[in-house]
Amino acid sequence: KKTLSLEKGLAVDTFQTHLKFGWGDKNFFLRTKEWSDMEVGTVLNTVFGRGPGAMHLILCTPKDLDPKSMVEVKVSKSQYQRLCAFIQCSFRFENGKAKMIEHHPYGTYDFFFDSPIEYNMTYTCNTWTNNALKRAGQKACVWTPFKGAIFSKYAVRSSQK
């Protein structure tokens, strides 16, 4: 049985009630905590190269969430289970446990895990998100390396407000 073992491996307190998942280029994650940390070599390798992927988990509070950069997606129980299965397949497991990346420049509530999925210019973080939505039976693009196309699927038209 594969498990993320989050309840034993993450520093949790009573204020961190939400968990954000993301997938992306491992080297970019580990070298670019802030946009000001960005280096030309890292960007070029991320855009034009191929490299290992990583999962990024962030424990947060509701006030840490920016509603302007989020959309609500309602899912059924079976859609939720399919989404969780997709996310779980994005972790590399060793001896049944997700392989955590121990050293990174982020904070106490950030966690990184190795992923078996390779990052490249045709499979980006936005492609991963789009595929997660597809797996959950939600609106998604045929393919997208950019977030704008995904968000446009969930845009509220002025006539619907």
Language-model features and meaning:
Residues C89-K161:
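Activation targets extended, charge/polar-rich intrinsically disordered C-terminal tails
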Residues D66-S76, F111-N120:
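Second-shell loop/turn segments in exported
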